[in-house]
Every structure is written in C-alpha cells, then in structure tokens.
Amino acid sequence: MTPMNVGFLGLGKLGLPCALALDDEGHQVFGYDISEVTMKNIANKVLPYREEGSQELLDKNSMFLCYDSQDLVANCDIIFVPIQTPHDPRFEGTTRLTEERADFDYDWLKAGITDLNTQMESLDRFPIVVIISTVLPGTIEKEILGVLNPKFRLCYNPYFIAMGTTLADFRNPEMILFGTEDEDAAEVLQELYSTVHNAPFFRTTIKNAELIKVAYNTYIGMKIVYANTMMEICEKSGVDVDSVIDCLSMASDRLISPKYLRGGMGDGGGCHPRDNIAMSWLARELDLSFDFFETLMVGREYQTEWLAELLMTTSEASDRDPFMLGEAFKEQTNLTVGSPAILMKNMIQEGWGLDIPIHDPHTNDVPFPTEAKVFF
C-alpha cells in the first residue's frame, strides 16, 4: 500500500514507541511534543527509559520532528493523540485507598485537542484525529466534542499495552478497538494497521470504546485479586497454589472463555451461591486478608435489587403490571435451588409488598399472560 502521512501529538512513553513502529513500516511519521527535553532527547536518539526494542528503532528512524503543532497538522492525514490523562498520586495505587475518588485529569488532553482544532481551521481539509489516551465513558462527548469544529474527524482508539513492552504490544495486539461514527476514518485506520499486524478490528461507538478500555484494565485487576485469594488460602491451608491455578487454567470452556460475560441475572444453582457462602466462612476461619467471596455474594444481592427496582419503576411508569419469565436457576431445567429469579421475587415481596407471578413451563403452572405486561 502507499505509505501514509501519520502524526503523533505527544512523544512520551506511549506515543514514541508507536510512532517508531509505524516509521519502521515505511510510513512517513511526523512527531511533536510540547516538552523541549523530550524533543531534544529524540533528536539526539536518547531514550531515557527502558522500552524493549525502541532504542534500536530510534537509532535508525526517519521520523520528522515538528517544532509546533501547526507544522504537524499541515503534513498529516492521520494524527494520533497519546496525551496523558494523569491521576493525583494518591490514586495511582502506591498508597492506601481512601474514601475519596476522582476522575482522570483531562486538562492536558483538552488543551492538545483544542490546539489541533485551532490549527485545522486554516486548512481546506481535516485530518483524522485519533485519541489514544485512557478516559472514562462519556468523557469525549462531555469534555471535548463541544469545543470542536463540526468537521473535526475525531476517533477513539485506546491501546491495550503495558509500559516496558509498548512496542511489542503495539505490533502484536489481541485486537484493535476503534470508536467512531466516521466510516471512512475507520477504513483508513484499518488499512494503516494492516501494515503492522493482522489483529481483528473491532469498531464501535466512541462511548462504547471508552468503557471497553477501562473494563479491560479492571478485569485484569479482578483476576489478580482472585489469584491472590487462592494463593493466600493455599498458604494458610497447606495446598499447592500452582496445582490449583494450573488446573483452573485448563477450564477453557467456562472459565477462560467468553462464557458468563453477558449481563443478566446473578448466578444460581445448587453449587455457586452456596459455595461462595461456604468459602466466605472459610475466609473467616483462615482469617484471610480479604473476603473475596463475601464481595461476590453482596454484589449478587445489590445487582438483583437494582434489577428489581428497574422492573418496578418501569412497571409504575408504564401503568402495566410486572411479570417474570423463568423461575428455574437456568434455562431448560426445573431446578429452582439458588435461583436468582426467586431471590428477586422475594426482594419485590419485601420492598413493594407484591407477590409477583413467574411463568416457567418447567417449574409451575402459572399461565403466560394474554394482556400487556412489563416482562422480565
């Protein structure tokens, strides 16, 4: 394919390795960073941090360094924006968690995008601008789109990389997540990435992509807490943790798979809820540092309460009676032990004083209604 003119507004620990990778694939890469120190280091081929493979590419790169954003905009068809969205040091995981919470700081990102918008106003074309930075869902719509020219071609394309292996992760991703409403922009970026790898290209809305990025990161955190819970149980009960995790890792059908990743009711049946409660008892017996299993059951109850409230408020707003479908703990069975549907029915009984009917041809003879209802 014809080499593309690609720019990077930000040449830090994320932007520079990715820029070097595209340069190495033969694209014409332009880079600009507001830090004079960063620009000087790159010009002198100095990488002040360890990033596997990047120094070798920096030594032989043919990237053009732009000394203002106007020069960057004038030369590029695609501009990546890997500008940091920092957090207060209190929220970076090196100190104890407090009651306070905070969103990321978007000031640097907003300033960079606003600058690009200003520079583009003098052009007769609008390059595709691709934000890479991590943001929370709704941020781009709320914080950025309102200040931009309507012709501004904005996309969101966060990377799933880890510092230290940025170059390798960029070249060998699991997938490319791309949020945009611009069909042409998506096709151009898909063509660009095809010169680097053959990873699947997942296109969605910007807001969806914003959540997917942080959902991915926090899912990893959840796995680590679970694994460390197993480690602590094993340490305190004389069990081999490697044997436990090695066996669980073989469960590629239900555990290490997309199964159970769709939203819906909580888990049920004769094993899951009772096992969590039994393991919570064991956590207390062993004096675990954290009762992961109690958290699971509390989450199950809170989410069931939320679903019950959603059903009842929808019922009240529509002036239609609520009606539940499915009493068993899962489809195609008549077993009701541990059923989250029964838990929800009981919560509605407690909270609203309503004995809500449930139709399930496998468990009862409650007929399917003929009149309009709010079904759940």
Predicted regions and their residues:
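Structural/interface elements that position substrates and couple domains in central-metabolism enzymes
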Residues: 2-376
